[in-house]
């Protein structure tokens, strides 16, 4: 036992074919499966046992094929879960895999994934309930999908954290989220060859989304559409930083629509967000808008507390629609509500916007 865990220790082993570990469990306590510094020529498949909590350690491992890690579920005829395996933590720093990485963790205990300095030659598909995905400095040659980050209601755990800072992604990046907890996405100095799309639905008093992509380079377009579903009036909202980022395609923020507690698709008056994008470079249009199809009155328009585009170079047009400008910034940056000094764009238009300062 180590930290109340029992170990299945396969550290530093060499396997000429495939390695499959399924339904292993500890008699007392959690099970830690150790494959650090191992060398497997083929695929690796790890499946947690039902009713068992498992920890997976793949640090410095070398895998010649695909890596698959999953939690099993047993359902009754009505689709209700009868038994569920749990993977609490996956440590895979410096992992080298010649194939794809697939992680499926649907159980609602929030798995922690550490993927620092990893090298994945194929795609990475990360589905399920994560506490955090820490993949800074990693290189993934294929597409990356992070999906269904559902959190339990009234969860005491902190915000979901997704980090690809200073990483390299050879295709597109898609992050989908929904649930009660706020989410923070870090793309500091990341290099993504394809499109980046961050989307989903959040609900609850603490739900908000924060995106940091300062100095990032995106070879395609960037789309941010994470709509809070408000159940209580709060001062929380969305913060987006794109300072000195380079986007070869277009930038789209919104529609910023939200669902009220009764389920109606109406703009939430308490929803606010801020865009800090000094020195931003885009090859296409920049569109910032709430859902103009709803036709909500101006007092219901989403608050845009800061729009800072000083020194930006927009290759297309700037289009801002259905937002309400206010000066109630939560962040102290010494900037006005709208600041576009020395910015360049093909055209700039503000449609159905209102100003509420002071």
PLM regions with names:
Residues 1-358:
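N-terminal leader/targeting and pre-domain segments
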């Amino acid at each position: 036992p180590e930290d109340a865990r029992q170990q299945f220790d396969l550290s530093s082993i060499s396997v000429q074919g495939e390695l499959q570990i399924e339904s292993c469990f500890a008699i007392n306590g959690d099970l830690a499966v150790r494959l650090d510094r191992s060398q497997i020529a083929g695929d690796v498949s790890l499946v947690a046992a039902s009713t068992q909590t498992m920890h997976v350690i793949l640090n410095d491992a070398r895998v010649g094929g695909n890596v698959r890690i999953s939690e099993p579920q047993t359902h009754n005829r009505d689709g209700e879960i009868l038994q569920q395996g749990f993977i609490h933590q996956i440590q895979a720093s410096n992992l080298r895999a010649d194939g794809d990485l697939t992680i499926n963790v649907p159980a609602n205990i929030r798995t922690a994934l550490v993927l620092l300095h990893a090298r994945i030659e194929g795609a990475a598909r990360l589905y399920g309930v994560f506490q955090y995905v820490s993949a800074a400095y990693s290189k993934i040659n294929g597409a990356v999908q992070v999906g269904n980050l559902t959190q339990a209601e009234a969860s005491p755990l902190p915000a979901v954290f997704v980090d690809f800072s200073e990483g390299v992604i050879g295709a597109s990046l898609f992050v989908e989220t929904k649930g009660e907890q706020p989410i923070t996405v870090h793309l500091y100095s990341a290099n993504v060859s394809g499109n980046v799309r961050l989307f989903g639905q959040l609900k609850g008093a603490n739900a908000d989304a924060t995106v940091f992509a300062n100095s990032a380079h995106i070879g395609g377009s960037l789309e941010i559409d994470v709509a809070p579903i408000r159940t209580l009036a709060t001062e929380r909202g969305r913060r987006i930083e794109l300072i000195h980022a380079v986007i070869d395609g277009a930038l789209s923020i919104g529609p910023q629509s939200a669902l009220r507690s009764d389920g109606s698709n109406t703009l939430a008056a308490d929803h606010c967000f801020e865009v800090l994008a000094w020195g931003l470079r885009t090859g296409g249009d920049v569109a910032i808008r709430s859902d103009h199809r709803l036709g909500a009155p101006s007092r219901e328009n989403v608050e845009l507390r800061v729009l800072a585009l000083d020194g930006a170079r927009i290759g297309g047009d700037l289009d801002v629609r259905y937002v309400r400008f206010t000066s109630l910034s939560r962040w102290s940056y010494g900037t006005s509500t709208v600041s576009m000094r020395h910015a360049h764009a093909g055209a700039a238009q503000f449609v159905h916007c209102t100003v509420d300062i002071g």
